Amino acid sequence: VLKRFSLISLAILGLYTAFPAQAQVLVPHVLQLDGDQLEQQGLILAQEAVQLAQFQQYQLALTRAQLASQLVPNNAQVWALLGGLYLQTEQTDPAVKALNKAQSLDPKNAAVLFALGSAYFRQEKYDMAVQYLKMGLQIKPETPGALFDLGNAYYKLNRLDEAIAEYEKAVKVDAKFWPAVNNIGLLRYEQGKTDIAISQWRQALSIDDNQPEPKLALAVALYGQGNQAEALRMGEAALRIDSRYGEIKFLQDNLWGQRLVGEAKKFLALPKIQQTLVELKQKSSGQSNPGQTN
């Protein structure tokens, strides 16, 4: 798993209680506003942006947050909100600029530091990601999502023992944090410790049996051990939950290593699995073209 829990979303929602509730909405043609009024209107816009973000209306939220940052340029929370929304809309470069501004105004804000770590990770600047995630964890050490992200950054730097250590810390903080359990399995499989990997994926599924990634990883590993019936059943179930796991690029994006990807290619090429993928693709095409007739 690359990223399952959005620290950015948590930071955005956390701002919801930080902005004062206002009954009025922004009046579009207000003349001669003084500094206090401008600040109030900026905070109203920021509050609206948070509310829109809660309903996943990110582009509308972003427009309001951009204006809010102009009206309240010295408010770290507004800049953090703007940076988070840029990340949410896959605009990483402006996200880093906004988050750096937030951090300059509030250096000890762990959520901002975590968000910067996430942003640098997306830019593939893994050393920078490690730096900012560790800074945030010095302030809030028991944050499982940040520990998980730090593990992923170490994974990308091929610092595997450190990655596993961070994943294990995340699970110690939150025993139900299945992505960290899953990723320990990914690493152990690459190390040739197949039985340990299988145990990790079974543990992840005991936490949430509806997660396709540990289900498919377990299927691939079991097939390699000759347990074909269970492997095919689990693999088909995983793909029916999320057919993207039938794409090798998607597996690689989610930190599947070379050894597991190699076995996954063989598994996904099996006639039964290919039949399932074709069926799912046809079903998806039918849903996207409901008015089309033969």
Please provide the spans of the model-predicted regions.
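Terminal, low-structured helical/coil segments at or just beyond the last alpha-helical repeat
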Residues: Q24-L38, A237-N294
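Helix-start (N-cap) detector for alpha-helical repeat units in TPR-like alpha-solenoids
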Residues: G35, G42, A76-Q77, A110-A111, ...
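Structural marker of alpha-solenoid helical repeat scaffolds
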Residues: L71, L105, I139, V173-D174, ...
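TPR/TPR-like (Sel1-like) alpha-helical repeat modules
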Residues: R202, S206, P212, L216-E247, ...
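Alpha-helical segment of the N-proximal tetratricopeptide repeat
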Residues: L38-Q77, L81-Q91, S118, R122-K125, ...
